[in-house]
C-alpha cells in the first residue's frame, strides 16, 4: 500500500477502467441491475471502459478482468462468489494496477474464520511488495445471511458517494453506502 500511494503506476489508463460482475443465478436479476446502475455512475464520472460479466465462467472472467488492470472491480451475486475464491485472487497478475474492489455479498469479509482467510483478506494480502496483485482495498460483508436488496443499496451507494459526491476515502464511501439504507 505504501508503494501504491507514494509511487503509483501511471502507465496506461488502467485506473480509468472497471470490471463489473453480476451473477443473477441465485440472488436474481437485481445483481445485474445494480451493476448497470454502477456502470452509469462510472460513465458520468468519465470511466467508460467497463467490462461487464453477467454469464459464463465467472472465475476465469473475473481473473481476466483483474489482470487487464482496472481501477474498480465490483461483484454482486451470492455466497460463494460464483466459484471465485482466494486461489483465483492469488492467480492474478495485475501487478501495480491494484483496484478498489467491492465484493459485497455474504461472508466475503468473515475475518478470523476457521476455514482460512476471507476473500477480502485474500484481495489485500495477495502478492508481495515487489510483485503485487489483488487489490489495494477490498470491501465485503462480515457475516452470512445478508440480504440482496440491502447489499445492492450499499454497493450502489459506495460508488455514488465516491464518484458523484467526491468522497475520497473507501471507509467514508462505504459509510455513505450504508446511509442509503435509511
Task: Label the predicted regions.
Residues 1-182:
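Cysteine-dependent hydrolase recognition
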Amino acid at each position: 500500500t505504501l508503494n501504491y500511494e507514494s509511487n503509483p503506476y501511471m502507465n496506461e489508463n488502467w485506473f480509468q477502467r472497471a470490471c463489473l460482475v453480476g451473477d443473477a443465478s441465485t440472488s436474481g436479476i437485481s445483481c445485474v441491475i445494480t451493476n448497470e446502475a454502477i456502470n452509469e455512475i462510472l460513465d458520468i464520472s468519465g470511466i467508460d471502459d467497463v467490462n461487464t460479466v453477467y454469464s459464463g465462467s465467472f472465475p476465469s472472467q473475473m481473473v481476466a478482468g483483474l489482470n487487464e488492470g482496472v481501477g474498480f472491480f465490483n461483484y454482486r451475486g451470492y455466497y460463494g462468489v460464483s466459484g471465485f475464491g482466494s486461489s483465483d485472487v492469488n492467480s492474478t497478475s495485475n501487478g501495480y494496477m491494484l483496484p478498489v474492489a467491492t465484493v459485497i455479498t455474504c461472508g466475503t469479509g468473515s475475518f478470523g474464520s476457521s476455514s482460512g482467510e476471507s476473500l477480502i483478506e485474500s484481495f489485500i494480502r495477495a502478492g508481495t511488495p515487489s510483485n503485487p496483485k489483488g487489490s489495494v482495498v477490498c470491501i465485503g460483508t462480515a457475516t452470512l445471511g445478508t440480504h440482496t436488496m440491502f447489499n445492492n443499496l450499499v454497493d450502489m451507494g459506495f460508488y455514488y458517494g465516491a464518484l458523484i459526491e467526491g468522497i475520497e476515502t473507501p471507509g467514508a464511501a462505504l459509510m455513505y453506502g450504508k446511509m442509503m439504507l435509511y
